[in-house]
């Protein structure tokens, strides 16, 4: 997997950790500042049926609180959608962007 190659680089690991750190700090502050605003553009939400998102969240309902027009579904895969379900992902993207 390409992820293994990239994660051999300490800078990549550092950047990944910084992304998670931001999610529980500055991202929360930004979310709070935007609490009364909704994304006006149509939003496509895709997630893996066999991943954490499916088990722990309600993606369409959750995003409907933050966006005016939400579409999407679980794809027949796990966490790594492009690698696990490329054809299904492409079909969804082409349909959404057409």
Regions found by a protein language model. Name each.
Residues 69-98:
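Catalytic active-site module of serine/aspartate enzymes centered on a nucleophile-bearing elbow/loop
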Residues 1-66, 72-73:
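Conserved serine/cysteine hydrolase catalytic core
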């Amino acid at each position: 997997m390409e992820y293994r190659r990239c994660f051999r680089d300490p800078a990549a690991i550092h950047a990944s950790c910084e992304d998670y750190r931001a999610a529980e700090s500055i991202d929360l502050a930004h979310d709070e500042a935007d609490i009364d605003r909704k994304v006006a553009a149509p939003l496509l939400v895709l997630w893996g049926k066999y991943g954490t998102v499916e088990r722990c969240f309600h993606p369409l309902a959750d995003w409907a609180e933050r966006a005016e027009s939400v579409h999407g579904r679980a794809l027949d895969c796990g966490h790594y959608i492009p690698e696990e379900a490329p054809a299904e992902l492409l079909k969804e993207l082409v349909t959404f962007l057409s």
